[in-house]
Amino acid sequence: MKTISRRTGPMGLVTGALCLAMAACMALAMFTDFTMTSENNYQNLADMIGGRTMPLSVFTVCFAVLLRWAQTRFPRRGRGLTVLAVVMGAWWVLAQVYASRFRQIELLASASQLLKAVIAFVGMSALYDLFFRMLDDVLLRGTDVHVGAGGRLRRAYRAHPALLCGAAVLLCWLPNIVIAYPVAMNIDTAAQVEQAMGLVPYDGNHPPFGTMVLGWALALGRVLGSANLGLFAFTLAQAIFGAAVIGYAQATMRTLRAPVWLRALSLLVCAFAPCFCDNITVLLKDVPYALSAMLLCCELARAVIAQEPGYARSAGHAVRCAVACLGMLLFRNNGLGVVLPAALLLMLRVRREGWRAMLGAGARLLAPALLSLVIIAGVNAAYDVQPGSAGEAFSLPFQQTARFVQKHHDEIPQEEREIIDAVLDFEQLSGIYDAYISDPVKETYRLDAGAKELLAYFGVWAKQLLRDPLCYAEATLIQNALLFDPQTRNVAFFDVPGLTDEAAQALGVSKPDVLWRLMSREMTMRELLFALPLYTQLTSVGFYAILMLVVCVIARRERAGGMGVMLTVPVMTAVMIVLGPCLLWQDRYGFPIIYCMPLALAALWRQLRQRKA
């Protein structure tokens, strides 16, 4: 009697139909446009699909084949990654709604809009689930590419991986460095340069140590006879430090026996991604901060994951930890929020070895932290630094309050108005609130507000949270929608000196005409690169933030020891982004996530191989 196989029987047909429907949702999700083009539901859907039938058909077939293959090739291991895929699918839909501040999108405006949202949610959840399962399988199986042992370049890499990789990256950056002459900076650095020149007093809103270093660069320029040369020397020093850290990171990944594909891909990203090759030429406090965070991750990987004999007590380890911590604490005001949790987790990691081991582990990071506080105090005294605004620390609650005031202005009792007005200018909040950046709201912070006023304000903040939690959630989500969005291009470029006319004339900073022309061609080349497949993803904070969550889930499920310490830098960076002022066109806040995730992935690879052995 002929038997009906599971693949060709009724259940096989049902499974195949579901697989095809899911593949169609995945394909449609990639091309979904949430703009409502017509009030007619059929026309609205037709406008979204029109002209895309061929790519939709191709992607549907490809996804259907992948899904059928994944059923046997990539088994599900627990529910963690599935839940994460669903959450990321929902986040993707909301991110597409909130990612653009220039167009208003309503998901519930019509039945067709709601259908678009459902299709996109189902499709992206399935796409994320497929990607997560594939990555999970690659990590657990130890899938890698094999490279031949011969060749002069291969032998040089084995002998000097840090030197070779650092030199290669620096060579790739050379065109960007030349075109950036004499200097490129953002508005924050321009303000620091004006402080270093003495045009305005030093203030604590920007790290005073970084301002002092910029002053040294200007002093070097005076010695060399040109401010251009002094500022360009700073750029060169930053590029050399960056290449050295990246080379060292590649050597660390090799020590962890990271797969070839991970090392090669991360090196390519370091060489050609804007967060590296473009920003390494920019005087930007986030660049030395992120490079220092990368160096700290290297040291944590070698001491905690690789556990090289005697390395944790070596002088080289202590020096590199000190350089990393000082770089994080002196160039960014929030560096302490990363170093302290890392020190705490490091101490807890060795708690079974006794209190001496705990003190020794903590001292690696806490001693440089104390030294940085002494240095900052000295700089503050030497340059008479004006205290920064305390309101800088409350970006998120201020933003939530502003949205609540805009939404419920007439319903707020007089007593609550007065309490808010003691901290922020209540009457201005409704008009100046910008859902994507908290700076306009923070500018109304009253400098004379003390602890008493802030305590009363947070009491009102808590009451309003209970009154309309959705309002607070919207304020948080809109401002941080891009944090887990791998599709939207959210990259800022700083190509010009950015100085005020007064500062530029005083310094004599100028850019040759030929470099302006080359910069124009460089901008055209960027557009070409962003048109390449996967380039946007590999250069976006959202992609690496999602990868961070995947690594967290897998490490937790597999009980990979030491990963909590390794993930401190990217996780705390993500927390600070949520609490921070803005992410739109400010990808620099996420640089530590991009810089450190390849190392975290290499560490997880090492721990999974150790468990398997």
Show the residue positions of the predicted features:
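Transmembrane-helix signature of polytopic, membrane-embedded enzymes
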Residues: 76-82, 162-164, 249-272, 291
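Extracytoplasmic catalytic/substrate-binding loops of multi-pass membrane glycan-assembly enzymes
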Residues: 180-192, 201-217, 225-229, 592
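Transmembrane signal-anchor helices characteristic of membrane glycosylation enzymes that use polyprenol
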Residues: 18-34, 85-98, 158-185, 368-381
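Transmembrane-helix motifs of polytopic, lipid-linked glycan transferases
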Residues: 126, 236-257
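Membrane-proximal stem/loop segments at transmembrane-domain junctions that anchor or position
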Residues: 385-513
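Membrane-interface alpha helices of multi-pass inner-membrane proteins
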Residues: 317-332, 343-344, 368
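Membrane-interface anchor segments at the N-terminal boundary of transmembrane helices
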Residues: 41-58, 229-233, 478-567
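Specific aromatic-rich, kink-prone transmembrane helix
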Residues: 126, 130, 197, 289-308, ...
